[in-house]
Each structure stands twice: as structure tokens, then as C-alpha cells.
Amino acid sequence: MRVVAAMSGGVDSAVAAARALEAGHEVIGVHLALSQSPEAVRAGSRGCCSLEDSADARRVADKLGIPFYVWDFSDRFKADVIDNFVDSYAIGETPNPCLRCNEKIKFEALLDRSIALGFDAVVTGHYAQLHDGVLRRGVDADKDQSYVLGVLTDEQLAHCMFPVGDTVKPEIREEAADAGFGVANKPDSHDICFIPDGRTQAFLGSKIGLRPGLVRDTGGETVAEHDGVYGFTVGQRKGLGLPRETLDGRPRYVTDIDAHTGTVTVGTREDLRVGGIIADRLKRLDPEVHGREFDCEVQVRAHGGVVPARARLVDDPTPVTPAGRVKEADELPWRLELELLQPLEGVARGQAAVVYRPDEDGDILLGSGTIRATTALGAPIEEQPAPGTVGAVDADAIEQGEDAQR
């Protein structure tokens, strides 16, 4: 097959390209130029879109002896990822920009251009397994990236290859070193590539502006003021601006954010727990399960947040979501209701809920949706009139009182 290897400049995409070549495919390397201001993109080895990354990708392509190109998707990236990121926070949602980039850039813009140019597939370094249209978790549980691929359609997956998904990361680094790739020991990227200094709150503030509001406790008492709800995330403990210690001595966390009124609510850790999720913007879920319950596991964060659940698909014919967003053409006309069999903490509106079926050969990804509401423990799963929450953090971050999104 003729394939396009998406080369980020990291070790995973380098080995993916090498494996595609070794498998006998005709391979070209493509690096995506995503920033309209290259000098504003993170410099150094921890970014994923820097000029150094482009140079690293080119050196790997030269080592492999394959053609190398840089394709400029900066306009698409700004409109579909950066602007979406800002707009989502402005309406009280918490988007995952890496997931959005996969959906709109790597497996829409890149894939569409590749197919138009006569290529058969796109090769990436994602840690996921794909065989005969079945998408599974990667073998390396610590590096599994199937979650951020949950938004892909069956049609897109038919033109995807994930060559490193059956290997653990240390072996990938060894393989890269044996091949003489200079990126063999390059650190993984973790931060948001379009926020070079990692100051998400300042970035959002520069785009959204001051929107003062109140911080209230669960009893409705005003305990502080703030400059904008985008400075908070559900589960956040530090930096709340609370002027005094709580009477009971227990720490307080952000439990809810209402972007419409500008109100941030704080409460105890117990107040973070949810027992149900409602999701829309559904992808890949089998129409045959419509109207009946099925057991699954649901993951709500890229790393962690996996619990067993009982799910069902119900009709949701409205063309507009509760947040006012018009549904896209490839979204299924239903909503997903999930009864969590174990509670989750810090679940956010706007995050992805990715559904799996456990399997000994690697959990099978069934589909995904975007969280639009949650229900409290013991409450029925139904549309909630109260506004949704913003932000989501890993359990470890809650325990340490750190904000995992900032």
C-alpha cells in the first residue's frame, strides 16, 4: 500500500514509519505545521509542534530514505482546535485539545488530503491496536492512547495503521536506538502545544477577557470573588482564593462551574462524586444496541478514570445540543446514558466518555460521546436543568490538591 506516515518528530512516529517501511509499504513522511506563529510554539524536546520537532522528523525520514514533506494545516488547527478550545471554555465545557486534534486534523484534514492524493492509509505512532476494523487498547497500559482515538469513525479507521500498538514503550526506544534515530531518548510531550508556557489560565484570559464572578460554597454563601470561571477546574484545591480556613478544617474543591452566571461552587471531596453520565456527539456505537442496556467500561480521562457501567442509547433527535452547539453530520442521532457501577470524581461537561468492552486480548473500543451532564450518586439518569461543570482531574491530582489541567 501507499501510506503517509505522520511524523511528529518523536520516537513513536519514527518507529511507526520504520515499521511501515519494513512491512513493504510505499511510505512518505509528513510533518504537520500547525502554528501560525512558529516562534510561539514550544521550543525544545517536550513540545509536539515545534520547529525542532520538524527537523527531528526530517532527520528520521532521511535515515529511512523516504520522501519528506511539511503540510501546513495551521488555519484548520486554529479554527478547529484552538478556537474550539477557547469557545468551549467560554460556554462552560472542558475540551480535550489532543482528542480534538486527532478528530479534526490528523484523521480528517491529513487523512482526506492523503486519500485525495492517492494514498491508501495514514500511519501514526499511537499506542492502540487495530485489526479488521476492531480498535483495542495498546499493549502498553501506561501509554495506551485508544481514548483519544475514540472520536474516529469506522470509515476513518479503515484507512489507519498503528504499528507500535503491540509494543511497550521501552522496546520502542530500544528499536529506535538500534535504527540510529536521534530521537530514541527524546522525552514524551505532555503539555498543550499551542500554550508554550503552560499557563492555560492566562491564555484563556487573553482570549476571553475578564468575566468577574463569585465563588460560593454548597450552601450558597459567597466566600470569594474571581476574574473568570476559566481559571478553575472541577477537583481543583489550590488557588481558589478562599480568604479563610473552613470551619470543619476539611479541604475544599471546585465542585461545579456555571459559566452563564459566573459562579464557581466549592465543596468537599464527597461532593465531587457522580453516579451517572449523559453524553452526546456519539461516534461508532453499534445501532443494534439502541434502546437496550449493555454492560461496558467507561473512561472519562486520557489517563485513568475507568469504571464499569451500565449503558443504553436513547433517541436524541434535536439538531442542537443543550449548550447551543449544532450537531455535526457524522454524529449519531442518540444520546448515551451511563449508570456508573462505581462513582467517579471530577467528571466534566465537555470531556469525552469513551466506552469499552473488556477483552483479554485488549479492551475493545465501542465508541464515544461528549459528556453534557452528570447525575449525583443515587439520582436517576435524566437531563439535568442545572448547568454542567468545567474541568476534570485525575484522582492523584485531587489527592495532592493539584490542578491537572493547568
Curated annotation (Swiss-Prot):
<dbReference type="Pfam" id="PF20259">
    <property type="entry name" value="tRNA_Me_trans_M"/>
</dbReference>
<protein>
    <recommendedName>
        <fullName>tRNA-specific 2-thiouridylase MnmA</fullName>
        <ecNumber>2.8.1.13</ecNumber>
    </recommendedName>
</protein>
<feature type="site" description="Interaction with tRNA">
    <location>
        <position position="126"/>
    </location>
</feature>
<keyword id="KW-0547">Nucleotide-binding</keyword>
<dbReference type="InterPro" id="IPR023382">
    <property type="entry name" value="MnmA-like_central_sf"/>
</dbReference>
<dbReference type="Pfam" id="PF03054">
    <property type="entry name" value="tRNA_Me_trans"/>
</dbReference>
<feature type="compositionally biased region" description="Acidic residues">
    <location>
        <begin position="396"/>
        <end position="406"/>
    </location>
</feature>
<dbReference type="GO" id="GO:0005524">
    <property type="term" value="F:ATP binding"/>
</dbReference>
<keyword id="KW-0963">Cytoplasm</keyword>
<feature type="binding site">
    <location>
        <position position="125"/>
    </location>
    <ligand>
        <name>ATP</name>
    </ligand>
</feature>
<dbReference type="GO" id="GO:0005737">
    <property type="term" value="C:cytoplasm"/>
</dbReference>
<feature type="disulfide bond" description="Alternate">
    <location>
        <begin position="101"/>
        <end position="193"/>
    </location>
</feature>
<dbReference type="InterPro" id="IPR014729">
    <property type="entry name" value="Rossmann-like_a/b/a_fold"/>
</dbReference>
<keyword id="KW-1015">Disulfide bond</keyword>
<dbReference type="GO" id="GO:0103016">
    <property type="term" value="F:tRNA-uridine 2-sulfurtransferase activity"/>
</dbReference>
<dbReference type="Pfam" id="PF20258">
    <property type="entry name" value="tRNA_Me_trans_C"/>
</dbReference>
<keyword id="KW-0808">Transferase</keyword>
<dbReference type="InterPro" id="IPR046885">
    <property type="entry name" value="MnmA-like_C"/>
</dbReference>
<keyword id="KW-0067">ATP-binding</keyword>
<dbReference type="InterPro" id="IPR046884">
    <property type="entry name" value="MnmA-like_central"/>
</dbReference>
<feature type="active site" description="Nucleophile">
    <location>
        <position position="101"/>
    </location>
</feature>
<dbReference type="GO" id="GO:0002143">
    <property type="term" value="P:tRNA wobble position uridine thiolation"/>
</dbReference>
<comment type="function">
    <text>Catalyzes the 2-thiolation of uridine at the wobble position (U34) of tRNA, leading to the formation of s(2)U34.</text>
</comment>
<feature type="region of interest" description="Disordered">
    <location>
        <begin position="378"/>
        <end position="406"/>
    </location>
</feature>
<feature type="site" description="Interaction with tRNA">
    <location>
        <position position="351"/>
    </location>
</feature>
<dbReference type="InterPro" id="IPR004506">
    <property type="entry name" value="MnmA-like"/>
</dbReference>
<keyword id="KW-0694">RNA-binding</keyword>
<keyword id="KW-0820">tRNA-binding</keyword>
<comment type="similarity">
    <text>Belongs to the MnmA/TRMU family.</text>
</comment>
<feature type="binding site">
    <location>
        <position position="32"/>
    </location>
    <ligand>
        <name>ATP</name>
    </ligand>
</feature>
<feature type="active site" description="Cysteine persulfide intermediate">
    <location>
        <position position="193"/>
    </location>
</feature>
<feature type="region of interest" description="Interaction with tRNA">
    <location>
        <begin position="143"/>
        <end position="145"/>
    </location>
</feature>
<keyword id="KW-0819">tRNA processing</keyword>
<feature type="binding site">
    <location>
        <begin position="6"/>
        <end position="13"/>
    </location>
    <ligand>
        <name>ATP</name>
    </ligand>
</feature>
<dbReference type="GO" id="GO:0000049">
    <property type="term" value="F:tRNA binding"/>
</dbReference>
